Design a protein with these regions (language model features):
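Histidine-acidic metal/acid-base catalytic patches
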Residues: 1-19, 23-113
Length: 113
């Protein structure tokens, strides 16, 4: 994989990544495995959830889709290098402010503020 070549060619302080939970899942990969693989290279993470409407994947507020958030957040804490968790939702099924509030409330219920 190209990413493996990048990891071998550059030190963590020379090359970092912004991991996007939705797109890792959409690509068919395991989010926690990628967090572990890039553990010392992810200063920020885009938190996006994935739900299914009919047969189609859609973006959802964090906590309303099928991503294992408690496991993801525990894995990030274990790796200990991520400074910023950024709630992001490219496409909203309702008001973006409502979606942001739902994501915030869910993450707050897990102790994140």
């Amino acid at each position: 994989l190209v990413i493996d070549t990048l990891l071998e060619s550059f030190a963590p302080e020379e090359l970092g990544f912004t991991l996007d939970t939705y797109w890792v899942q959409m690509g068919g990969a395991d989010v926690c495995s990628w967090i572990e693989k890039l553990s010392d290279r992810i200063p920020c993470v885009h938190l996006k959830d994935m739900a299914v409407k009919g047969w189609d994947p859609i973006m959802a507020p964090v906590g309303e889709g099928n991503l294992p958030w408690e496991k993801i957040l525990q894995t990030l804490e274990k790796c200990g290098k991520t400074k910023y968790l950024l709630v992001e939702q490219d496409v909203c099924q309702e008001s973006p402010f409502t979606c942001l509030e739902k994501s915030y409330n869910y993450l707050s219920s897990l102790g994140y503020k």
